[in-house]
């Protein structure tokens, strides 16, 4: 049985946030009363689901000091008053001249897009989903995915062609300028690729472009991109590679770019209030005729804690939130103020095991212990209770990835077999391990982790949580190899719908993200990213999946079904590639 707060406890937790908003002057008394009445109406619908567990509230903004905790839920800290929400509704005694609507005003769209801040405003110097989303608004890519066909279509590029097995010709749109007036040309494209593939730049995205050997400028609006070997997912990589102005970058340097993003996108950067929000203003000179955002201002807010986020959504001080736990969907949908949007996405969640002793020697170096951990966990039970619609990923790949093999069988829930495997590995009395956790976009992450902890301990794998509330601290530790012997993780494949988008980064021994080393798998992954024959690639990834399943370098979990909360005053839909495009949002008339 999965334990969690009662509907009353959850109601009180959300209402406490509204009281705080009122005390801070962020909402007036009328809004407080209205929000409380709305939530009371939805709380009854929540009751039947609340027993599924506590909300995912282990994230925090970067203004918090990193905190390590032992046990279940992570600490949270309320954000400071950022002072940039729409004005409060007036009370009857207030002057109506200060009136502002609840929800979008027509001028401003307010999105709570993260619980943790970004490390930088440089689109090349991060590996965070929230960074991708933010920079999709200020910058453009050579290609963009069509959500209807799932194909990459030209954007800054006018066309591309594989003119030789290892050469791609890209023709660029003419007449596009950056927000500072610099022109976008072939020199821009070459400079951006040269920068991100330069090892001295130390971009966390270098692996996305490891196949690039060189870029030649043919004329002002044509480049030839040469790959080391034939590169079948070259076009997929074009949809997540934001262009920055080379002249500005050369003149001002990396430190300037880290604070002042300049792109060609539909919104311009205004201000980064660290730990609080990113303020953007519509680019009224945007080059694409079909993109004309109705909101003049877009505010991307950092708000720790799902209860706080939901309180803001239902109080009308936020228009979109990126995470709504499944057990709170009914309350939002019945609120009359907002509704939920559900989308199966490419992101995969898993619990990584340090199979290569990257952090330190540990029991998970033994494959029998790794299989024991997988058999100890009732993955399908967690899906049924906490992740409705989640897709099993028996060898890490999501069914949405090209190369997915549906014949791979997942580990069965078998506690007795788990105990036998531990004993065979020399641990008849079990093991004691630390599980490192950081902020996560997985719905109900806390409940999932706690349920897994109980199941693991039932077979003798005794787990102590180390919860890092600051996402930047967790990412740094993870990438430096200090997140063993086990840690929670999820990966969105940089929105590449191909096995290479997750396997190479998560499992190839050269990756900064990996905690596993297998030369046979490395060779297959290299072959998979070099063959242009789809059938050959399918066979390569079938073999790779069998190795991954047999080696079990992580506890395999599921592909996400994500839930967003959207104000009833806003017409907007999420995407399967998990790149939220808020410039497509429209006010409901």
Over which residues does each language-model region extend?
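Surface-exposed binding/hinge segments that line
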Residues: 161, 205-248, 271-273
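A structural "hinge/loop" feature
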Residues: 115-132, 155-156, 182, 204-205, ...
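Gly/Pro-rich hinge or "lid" segments in bacterial periplasmic/extracellular proteins
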Residues: 146-151, 239-293, 297, 416, ...
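N-terminal secretory signal peptides
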Residues: 1-31, 40
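N-terminal lobe/hinge region of extracytoplasmic solute-binding protein
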Residues: 112-164, 194, 262
């Amino acid at each position: 049985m999965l334990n969690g707060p009662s509907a009353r406890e959850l109601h009180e937790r959300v209402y406490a946030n509204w009281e705080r908003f009122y005390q801070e002057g962020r909402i007036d008394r009328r809004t407080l009363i209205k929000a409380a009445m709305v939530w009371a109406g939805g709380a009854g619908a929540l009751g039947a689901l609340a027993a599924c567990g506590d909300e995912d509230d282990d994230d925090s903004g970067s203004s918090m000091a990193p905190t390590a905790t032992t046990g279940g839920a992570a600490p949270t800290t309320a954000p400071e008053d950022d002072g940039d929400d729409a004005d409060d509704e007036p009370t009857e005694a207030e002057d109506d001249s200060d009136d502002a609507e609840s929800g979008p005003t027509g001028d401003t769209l307010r999105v709570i897009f993260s619980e943790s801040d970004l490390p930088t405003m440089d689109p090349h110097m991060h590996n965070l989903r929230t960074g991708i989303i933010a920079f999709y608004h200020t910058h453009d890519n050579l290609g963009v995915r069509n959500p209807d066909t799932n194909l990459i279509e030209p954007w800054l590029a006018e066309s591309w062609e594989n003119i030789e097995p290892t050469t791609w010709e890209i023709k660029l749109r003419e007449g596009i300028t950056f927000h500072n007036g610099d022109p976008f040309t072939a020199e821009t494209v070459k400079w951006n690729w040269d920068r991100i593939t330069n090892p001295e730049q130390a971009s966390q995205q270098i692996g996305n472009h490891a196949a690039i050997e060189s870029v030649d400028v043919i004329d002002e609006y044509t480049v030839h991109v040469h790959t080391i070997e034939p590169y079948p997912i070259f076009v997929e990589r074009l949809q997540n590679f934001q262009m920055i102005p080379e002249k500005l970058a050369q003149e001002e340097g990396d430190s300037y770019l880290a604070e002042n993003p300049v792109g060609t996108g539909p919104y311009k950067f205004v201000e980064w209030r660290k730990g609080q929000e990113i303020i953007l203003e519509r680019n009224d000179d945007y080059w694409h005729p079909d993109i004309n955002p109705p909101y003049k201002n877009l505010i991307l807010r950092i708000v720790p804690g799902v209860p706080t986020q939901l309180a803001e959504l239902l109080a009308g001080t936020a228009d979109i939130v990126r995470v709504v736990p499944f057990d709170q969907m009914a309350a939002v949908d019945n609120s009359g103020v907002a509704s939920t949007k559900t989308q199966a996405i490419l992101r995969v969640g898993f619990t990584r095991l340090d199979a290569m002793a990257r952090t330190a020697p540990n029991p998970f170096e033994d494959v029998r212990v790794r299989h024991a951990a997988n058999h100890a966990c009732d993955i399908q039970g967690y899906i049924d209770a906490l992740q409705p619609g989640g897709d099993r990923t028996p060898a890490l790949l999501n069914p949405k990835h090209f190369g997915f093999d549906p014949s791979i069988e997942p580990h069965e829930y078998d506690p007795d077999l788990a105990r036998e495997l531990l004993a065979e590995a020399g641990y008849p009395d079990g093991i004691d391990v630390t599980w490192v956790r950081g902020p996560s976009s997985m719905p109900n992450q806390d409940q999932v982790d706690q349920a897994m902890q109980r199941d693991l301990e039932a077979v003798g794998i005794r787990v102590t949580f180390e919860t890092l509330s600051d996402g930047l601290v967790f990412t740094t530790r993870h990438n430096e190899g200090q997140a063993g012997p086990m840690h929670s993780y999820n990966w969105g494949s940089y929105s590449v719908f191909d096995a290479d988008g997750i396997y190479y980064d998560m499992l190839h021994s050269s990756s900064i993200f990996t905690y596993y080393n297998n030369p046979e798998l490395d060779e297959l992954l290299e072959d998979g990213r070099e063959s242009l024959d789809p059938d050959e690639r399918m066979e390569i990834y079938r073999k790779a999946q069998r190795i991954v399943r047999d080696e079990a370098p992580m506890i395999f979990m599921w592909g996400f079904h994500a839930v967003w909360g959207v104000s009833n005053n806003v017409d907007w839909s999420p995407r399967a590639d998990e790149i939220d495009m808020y410039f497509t949002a429209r006010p409901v008339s």
